[in-house]
Amino acid sequence: MGQLKGLPVEDGFRMPGEYEPHIGCFMIWPERPDNWRLGGKPAQQNYKEVAVAISNFEPVTMFVSPNQYKNARKELPDTIRVIEMSNDDAWIRDYGPSFLVNDKGEMRGVDWGFNAWGGLLDGLYFPWDKDNQIAKKVCDLERLDYYSQKDFILEGCSIHVDGEGTLVTTEECLLSEGRNPNLTKIEIEQTLKKYFHVQKVIWLKHGFYLDETNGHVDNIFNFVAPGEVVLSWTDNKSDPQYEISRECYDILANQTDAKGRTFMIHKLHCPDPVLITQTESEGVEAINGTFPRQAGDRLAASYVNYYTANGAIIFPLFDDPKDKDAQELLEQLYPDRKIVGIKAREILLGGGNIHCITQHLPDKSTIRE
């Protein structure tokens, strides 16, 4: 158990698709008052609902700061493991480890650099040192060896893989000046191929409109299965999201995956624009060094930001008529999984959604055929 030399691609380790079997899910309990309104209490209820929903299908571990341990333990059912772990905020998908498996039933992690989505240039909070230690701590907890790439800034929400050699990301995020400004697009792509063991990287131009993380791919795109994808969509041509989604569609429609398959693309219509209310804005404490959210600001509300669990899809609800449409499409796309909707406005107010606040632990016995 410790830091490894070498590269995953040389050692035969790959990142599996999220739809492959899991042995668990990690989350972090929200609390910081400059991001979560009313001291995080409303968001904690949303996180609890997500954790309970996932726990019906796979084990859930909730990491929580020392200040919130008693509260989280009281709020969460005994079926959810609660472990004390210092943190700066509650987005484990972004700074938890990337988990890799091989065909021998072994698992390893990757510890990437994290700088709060842009560092001192356009990051969302400072400091971020506690978050930057979480990947290594989780690997230690799970007794996993890990590769360290601390000089390379990468968030888990910025990439999606199909487990069969294809990775999708956005130029808006990975080429942003606050991430890896000294690396070229080709150099970034080479790193992705070496550490995720993929043969093809597909670059979408942009992520979801006004996504404050510089356009994470998980808010606009997801793999349903190898060769089959879902894309956030709107038919409203006056909405800036329309041109973004259309551009993504055109890129995907003219690409093949690493196996040479053309993509079957499903359009998952996003809700009508969701805006922050005055009351919600006033409930967040204003602190220097954090990114303020004002009344009337549009939030990046997308149904694509869902979690694929063992036997289930946990997706966000926005109290919009399209909630029902999203449920119906997901039921068609995942006939063998239960589709569970969770009201997720409080998570959205914090800057992300269900996929962002969860990190799956793959089943290390997953073997590629």
Curated annotation (Swiss-Prot):
Keywords: Hydrolase. The active site is at residue 356. One of its GO terms (biological process) is putrescine biosynthetic process. Pfam families: PAD_porph. It catalyses: agmatine + H2O = N-carbamoylputrescine + NH4(+). It is an enzyme of class 3 (hydrolase). Gene3D superfamilies: L-arginine/glycine Amidinotransferase, Chain A. It comes from the Bacteria. Its EC number is 3.5.3.12. InterPro entries: Agmatine_deiminase, Peptidyl-Arg-deiminase_porph. Belongs to the agmatine deiminase family. This is Putative agmatine deiminase 2.
